[in-house]
Every structure is written in C-alpha cells, then in structure tokens.
Amino acid sequence: MAKDYTNQHIVPKRYLDRFGTKDGKRTIIGVRIVNKGNVRFFTDSTVNVGYIKNYYDVTDKNDPKYWEHYFAREIDALCGQDMENIIAKVTLSCPDTIVLSAHDKEVLSKLIIAQLMRIPESIDYVKTVLYPRVSAQVKEDLVSTLPPAFVEKHREQIMNTEFPEQYQKELVLNHSFEPANFDRYCKVLQDGVWVVYANMHRDTMPFLTSDNPVLVEGIGKTETGLFRNGLANPATCIFYPLSPGIAVAIYSRQGIWGAVADEYDGRKVLLDELKYIMSRNINIMAQAHRHSFIPQPLYDAVKNGSV
C-alpha cells in the first residue's frame, strides 16, 4: 500500500482527468513546465504529473501515508461522481438558470479549501512566515511562566530552539484539516456569491488549470494567492475551473457583489469575454507550482506556435 502512495498528487488526478483526453485506460494531458526560465511543453498521463514524491508523509501518526489516504478518501473522491453531476447539470441547463444547490456548494467548497491548504506554497508560507511569528510569541509566553532563575540560565537556549521542518508541516496539516477549522473555512465560501461561468470559447480558448488551480484574487490588486488576499476579505474573488468549459467564481456578500447576490448566486452565466478568460488562464499558469495543464485542441496550437 505504501508504494501505491509514493507519488503523492498535490492536485487530484481525477480533477486533472477532466482537462485531458482519454487514450485507452490512460488520460493524456498537455503540460507546460518552466525550469530555470526555460519553457517546455509535453504530453503525459495524468498519473505522472502534478505530484511530489512522499510530500505528505508524516511521523506523528501510525500511518506515514495518513494524509495521502485522507485526501484520496475525503477530498479526491469528490472529483468523481459528485463533480460529474455538477458539470452535467451546468452543461444541460439553460443560461441564466440556477444550477448550484447547497450540496453542490458544500462539495466544491471542500475541494477548493483542501486544494488551497494542501499545496506546497501554503504549507511553505505557514512554515516560513507565520510559524516564526507564532513560535516567538509561544516562547515568550513560556518564559513568562517559568521561575526567574531558570529563565536567566536557559532563556537563550529556549529562544533559539525550533521545531524541525517536518514537525512544522505536520502542525500545518493537522490544524488546517481539523474538522472544526476545515468546516469553518468551507462555510466562508458557502456563504459567498457563486457565479458559474460557461466558457463560450471552449474550443479555441478553454479554461486552463495547474497543480495550483485555485486562483485567489483581490479586486483592484495585482497580487494573487490566499495569504496575500485573505479568504474572508470582502474584496477577494476565488476562481476555480471545473473543466475546460466550466468555472466557478466566488465573491463575498460583504463586497460589491453583495448588492446583486440574489440575482447571480448559483446562476449559470455565459462567458464570452475572451480577455477575462485569458487573464484567468495566465494567472493560473503563473502561480503553478511546477505544471500547468492545457486542454486540446489549444495544446496542439500552442505547441505548433499557431497561437
């Protein structure tokens, strides 16, 4: 079993399958990778992309593959029939109709929050930026509870002691996916205004995705990312492609979209603005950890230099 979970996907394989092309039992996907400033394009099976070897392995649980099993069971499984049902409903519905139920939002919010929390960028940010701040405060609090004589002798040793990086990563995963915390993050999204975009340019300019597919933007800001914009910020917009032809955008009810929440929440909107589609695609590629994914027929056009 452990061998089966050596190549640990940082984005669900079943999610990537929707952006690829079936080839027998495999699904082939177009890949863009930037290595030391050099851009390379290739095709490969979705089994072989979007993963990091042993990335989620832990030492604080009986099963070192605990998190990979958790993601496969609790999160990635949602990319199967649940996602299929949502996409089918959107595809078969008329424009301007309500296509997302409360259950659909629950499913998608779990996928989005888990994706935001499991990517290396989020884990590394917590380790390198947030953890040092918390660590310093925890040490100060600890020192304040100790006898003065002990502090005088050992203060420098206490303040210089750090948890190993592996422990820090385990701390991040345990905190992010603790049920009460995870449910609270999901509720923030569920309470937002959900707009379902049907891409009218799917055949020539489909939605792209990457191994970091959830785009968190701030209205009026150029920086992207969860920690630069915040999950509950009224100016935050979350954009998530479900397939080459369908994406959801989530806006805060406390922001400017709140005024039209009843009109747009859960509604299918035909998206004909090529500039908007290309902008989202560019940002999703730019924030990729390693791999961006380009559906057909756009992949062949890019590879051949015709676009």
PLM region spans:
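Alpha-helical structural context detector biased toward long hydrophobic helices
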Residues: 1-7, 11-307
